[in-house]
């Protein structure tokens, strides 16, 4: 009989008859080992990772230069600046009092000041997926 005409039951009975013919080996003659079973081999972690996929589905590795540029565009540093305002209730209008307040904040460094946040977001979406 060809391979196309073999069913699961046929395979099970043939395996059992072969096992019975080999004599008194332990575990070969019991009824449980002669039952036809379908064994689906689960994939190991290595097999799952090495399966071939189409090139479009494979993740693209980020360019290190792009990562460096984006890091420089995003990097901020702490800053403190003095905000000066004229006191409206000063006694002498010719020489008003100046109120100075220190403002603590963060600012973008270097040439990144000239790039808008929207453009930085566009670059990040395009370069790092």
Swiss-Prot record:
- Extract the Pfam families matched here: GP63 (PF17471)
The protein's name in its UniProt record: Gene 63 protein
Lineage of origin: Viruses, Duplodnaviria, Heunggongvirae, Uroviricota, Caudoviricetes
In terms of InterPro entries, this protein maps to:
Gp63
Gene that produces this protein:
63
